[in-house]
């Protein structure tokens, strides 16, 4: 398939799901507002799902981009809310998908760069409510491993500041060719101060001028719905 030359995507404007490739447990459906909504995993045990652009996106030499999306993590299981989701740039292909559980549907996808939104503490995690940068399908977080305000989020239903609290969260991710910046807000569309800014050479990691862009998520013994809406990428 040809690469998308104009580096601009707006999920609400998509008229056909052919613009996105859906893998594993993921589905695309019409939300309450009439626009497309991505369900990466249902609230069931042992799920893994991903959604990527069907065609690769052509970047400039520095991989400069900005993206905004909203997510909700709802209906946590008896063992707790788990496991989380990632936003990913990768060159493996539109059908890329890793394992479930703590692998978040991301482990093993390489070459790649991801921003992780993690809601379950595995042995390699700092806590059960953090954001991190991942590369090349490896789940050992790069620095900074940044907790978001609240820790010990099990169970987290209704707890402000826990990413799995069922609220609508807004996410801004920007890359200027040198620093990857991430900001998130609970129940707000006003951008706060950056949660993290991390120096990283995405062009060198991916090794080519185009990449597939999208999301992954996973559940284990614990589970939750992982839902994405209002995604804009440019």
What kind of region is each of these model predictions?
Residues 11-234:
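Polar, low-complexity loop segments and adjacent catalytic/binding residues used for recognizing
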């Amino acid at each position: 398939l040809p690469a998308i030359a104009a580096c601009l995507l707006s999920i609400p404007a998509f008229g056909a799901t052919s613009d996105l490739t859906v893998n594993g447990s993921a589905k695309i459906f019409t939300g309450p507002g009439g626009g497309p909504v991505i369900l990466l995993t249902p609230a069931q045990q042992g799920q893994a799902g991903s959604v990527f652009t069907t065609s690769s996106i052509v970047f400039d030499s520095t991989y400069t981009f900005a993206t905004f999306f909203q997510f909700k993590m709802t209906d946590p299981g008896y063992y707790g809310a788990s496991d989380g989701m990632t936003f990913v740039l990768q060159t493996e292909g539109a059908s890329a998908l890793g394992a479930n559980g703590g692998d978040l549907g991301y482990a093993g996808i390489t070459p790649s760069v991801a921003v992780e939104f993690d809601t379950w503490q595995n042995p390699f995690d700092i806590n059960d409510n953090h954001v991190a940068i991942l590369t090349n399908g490896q789940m050992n977080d790069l620095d900074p491993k940044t907790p978001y305000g609240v820790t010990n989020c099990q169970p987290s239903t209704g707890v402000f500041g826990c990413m799995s609290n069922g609220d609508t969260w807004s996410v801004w991710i920007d890359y200027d060719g040198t620093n990857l910046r991430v900001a998130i807000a609970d129940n707000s569309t006003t951008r706060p101060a950056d949660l993290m800014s991390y120096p990283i050479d995405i062009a060198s990691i991916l090794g080519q001028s185009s990449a597939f862009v999208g999301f992954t998520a996973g559940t284990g013994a614990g589970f939750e719905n992982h839902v994405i809406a209002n995604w804009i990428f440019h």
